[in-house]
Regions:
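Substrate-binding/catalytic cleft of secreted carbohydrate-active enzymes
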Residues: 1-153, 157
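Carbohydrate-binding surfaces of carbohydrate-active enzymes
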Residues: 97-270
């Protein structure tokens, strides 16, 4: 297969899952390092191959399986479901680390859809699939459901789970590098640092709005080249402590890219 690909298309790089198994047989059949389930800092060792800080062996690395939502921590999911929110924080750490790593190509969440199947008790025979499953759950956890579990960002009916939004936030190509609570001076502009994480799109090719006290206004974006940082300016308003400021970014086709909600000063406690 390697020989055919290289003879047919010399421009196409080749990836091979579990590349250490090929190296073990002295087969040089990959240009891209495929690794699975590194930690949030990009470190993992598999079959004699390893990455550190999302890099390894002097070639580009693609983590073609990573970061499925929490589905194996059965007891924790029952007692502390907020682990699902924390999963989004870890995904954000991973993508931000990989984005800045030389040769870091990307990471693919495995998988998109929950894998749970609710099966009735059989009229004849035994429920062999429960014992057969490699990821057998505690009986009080799974009931008559089998499968790897709720490891998707949409459920079995393709409804978006909270993890869907966490994924959009983590992979967002527009990142405001400011704290959730903004310092301000009433009647003066707000200056926000922004990171353009698009690969090809200049920031002035998209558009943005800001909403303050229920009034939404357009926001002019200055040129910021891909993979660079710049500033956006929120025009002066009569800012007040505890009020919220919402900033939204849209594609040229008016599709939502990301939303940020900030508190001016100290949040009001009701």
């Amino acid at each position: 297969c390697w020989d055919w690909i290289k003879a047919t298309d010399t421009t196409r790089p080749v990836i091979f899952s579990y590349p250490g198994s090929a190296v073990e047989k002295k087969a040089e059949i990959f240009d891209i390092l495929s690794m699975h389930y590194q930690n949030v800092y990009g470190n993992v060792g598999q079959w004699g191959m390893a990455t550190r800080n999302f890099q390894g062996h002097g070639i580009p690395a693609l983590f073609d399986e990573w970061a499925h939502p929490a589905c194996y921590t059965y007891a924790t999911l029952q007692t502390d479901p907020n682990i699902r929110e924390f999963w989004g924080k870890s995904l954000d750490m991973m993508w931000s680390g990989l984005f800045n790593a030389p040769g870091g190509l990307g990471g693919a969440i495995w998988g998109y859809v929950d894998e749970t199947f609710s099966l009735p008790e059989p009229k004849f025979g035994t429920s062999f699939w429960k014992e057969f499953a490699r990821t057998a759950k505690p009986l009080d956890y799974q009931g008559n459901c089998v499968g790897y579990g709720e490891w998707g960002i949409v459920d079995v009916w393709r409804r978006q789970k909270p993890e869907f939004w966490s994924t959009k936030k983590a992979y967002s190509p527009v990142r405001l590098l400011v704290e959730d609570n903004l310092s301000f001076t009433t009647g003066q502009e707000l200056m926000l640092t922004i990171h353009n994480r698009f690969d090809h799109t200049n920031l002035n090719e998209i558009h943005a709005t800001y909403t303050y006290r229920g009034v939404t206004k357009s926001l002019e974006l200055q040129p910021v080249a891909p993979h660079t940082k710049g500033m956006i300016v929120i025009p002066a308003e009569q800012w007040e402590n505890g009020e919220t400021l919402q900033v939204e970014f849209f594609t040229a086709a008016n599709e939502l890219i990301d939303v940020y909600r900030f508190v001016l000063g100290t949040e009001k406690i009701i």
